[in-house]
């Protein structure tokens, strides 16, 4: 990017995930990008959106987040359309975290559906997944309203809503014993990095850890589900 974007050129991050890091275990995209893109204002464009629905001009709401209020306002103005609403925010870490964690939780939701555990279980899983997201966000200094907004809850609900979600489809295949889809499931690669970062931060993410054990650790699904369900339930 530095070769094509002169210093002072805004860079908008649209990807969702983490980058492995030898010190912290993993970095969220703004953390990784800042030292590599010095002198270039950063922003994130994120939220609950399936690309094909955006292309079909179906109503969509996204978040433009930047440390610089003028940049988030500029992005919102440039990309807004009759069917595309862009809200503005300043919490880039919260926006990046929500987009990364939801991919892992969506795999768990898919496994839940593939195992035939029911709608009650899926609702509980999504809610507790949001709680895990909020715990890590608090540790990293993110804003709680970001996690309860489009980049957090909004993206999580969409990604856990059905097979249209690549990560949920991947989890469903695992849970039902069917061939794993060849399409990219970002959560598959994010799970281990997220686990490493959360351990660095001393934050426990039971659902995310379970997904990593199943996807990358070759742990039996039934064994891991039983372990999750046997955990003591504390204060919500």
Task: Show which residues each predicted segment covers.
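Rossmann-like NAD(P)(H) cofactor-binding subdomain of soluble oxidoreductases
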Residues: 1-57, 75-77
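Internal alpha-helical scaffold of NAD(P)-dependent oxidoreductase catalytic cores
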Residues: 4, 32-42, 59-146
């Amino acid at each position: 990017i530095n070769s094509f974007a002169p210093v002072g050129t805004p860079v908008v991050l649209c990807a969702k995930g983490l980058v492995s890091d030898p010190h912290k275990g993993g970095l969220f995209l703004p953390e990784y990008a800042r030292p590599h893109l010095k002198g270039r204002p950063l922003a994130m464009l994120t939220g609950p959106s399936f690309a094909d629905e955006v292309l079909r001009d179906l109503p969509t709401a996204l978040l433009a987040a930047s440390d610089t209020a003028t940049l988030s306002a500029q992005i919102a103005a440039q990309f807004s359309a009759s069917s595309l609403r862009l809200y503005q925010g300043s919490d880039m870490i919260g926006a990046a975290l929500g987009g990364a964690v939801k991919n892992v939780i969506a795999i768990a939701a898919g496994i839940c559906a593939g195992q035939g555990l029911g709608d009650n279980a899926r609702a509980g899983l999504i809610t507790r997944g949001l709680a895990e997201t909020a715990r890590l966000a608090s540790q990293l200094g993110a804003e709680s309203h970001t996690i309860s907004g489009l980049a957090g809850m909004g993206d999580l609900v969409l990604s856990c809503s059905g097979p249209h979600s690549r990560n949920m489809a991947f989890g469903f295949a695992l849970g039902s014993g069917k061939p794993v889809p060849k399409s990219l499931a970002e959560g598959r690669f994010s799970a281990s990095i997220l686990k490493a970062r959360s351990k660095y931060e001393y934050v426990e993410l039971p659902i995310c850890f379970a997904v990593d054990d199943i996807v990358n650790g070759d742990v039996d699904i039934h064994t891991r589900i039983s372990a999750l369900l046997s955990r003591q339930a504390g204060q919500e």
